Regions:
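FNR/FR-type flavoprotein reductase catalytic core
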Residues: 1-115
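Cys/His-clustered metal-coordination modules, chiefly Zn-binding fingers
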Residues: 93-173
């Protein structure tokens, strides 16, 4: 069973700086307002080396145009995304939906990344702090130890319920 890649806080596609993949036939640089400077800097670096195309987006209102641009590319195109988290996730998802692999995408996230935990008690997903090791489920209020494993199917790190020290008495009453 194949599960499509998803963008998460530790994805291999997330980089601090774009790296030109000169073996590719063309580059497509997609950025939102937040990622404009990163994209501009990268474009000045690659100008004259490989053909490229740029797309500036404003979020969901550009969804159809993003889809059109991605679908119109030939094999061998490398995609670069410089955007805030929500826009980066949207563009990444559209790319994967169109058939791109993680190797064909590099993403620079501008601003904070989002991290999600999948509760093994109520089977819901909650947003958690980026470096949190323990969290409380937003849905059932269970205390969760955040495991190291990210579930592509559940789109979150696995959260294992536990009873925190001091609450054992309440539970046993």
């Amino acid at each position: 069973l194949y599960n499509s890649p998803v963008l998460f806080d530790k994805s291999i596609t997330i980089v601090n700086q774009f790296t030109p993949r000169n073996e590719r036939r063309k580059f497509v640089v997609i950025s939102d307002h937040a990622g404009y400077e990163k994209a501009k800097s990268f474009i000045s670096e690659i100008t004259g080396t490989v053909p490229f195309e740029c797309l500036s987006i404003n979020g969901m209102e550009n969804k159809e145009e993003i889809k059109r641009v991605i679908l119109s590319q030939k094999m061998g195109t490398q995609f670069y995304i410089a955007a805030a988290w929500n826009n980066a996730v949207m563009v990444f998802s559209l790319g994967v939906e169109a058939g791109l692999s993680e190797a064909e995408i590099q993403t620079v996230i501008i601003g904070p990344k989002r991290r999600y935990v999948y509760c093994m008690k109520c089977f819901e997903v909650s947003e958690v702090a980026e470096e949190a090791e323990i969290a409380e489920c937003d849905h059932c209020r269970a205390s969760l130890e955040i495991g190291p494993f990210y579930s592509i199917v559940r789109e979150g790190y696995i959260g294992y319920p536990f009873i925190p020290v001091g609450k054992e008495e309440e539970v046993g009453s």
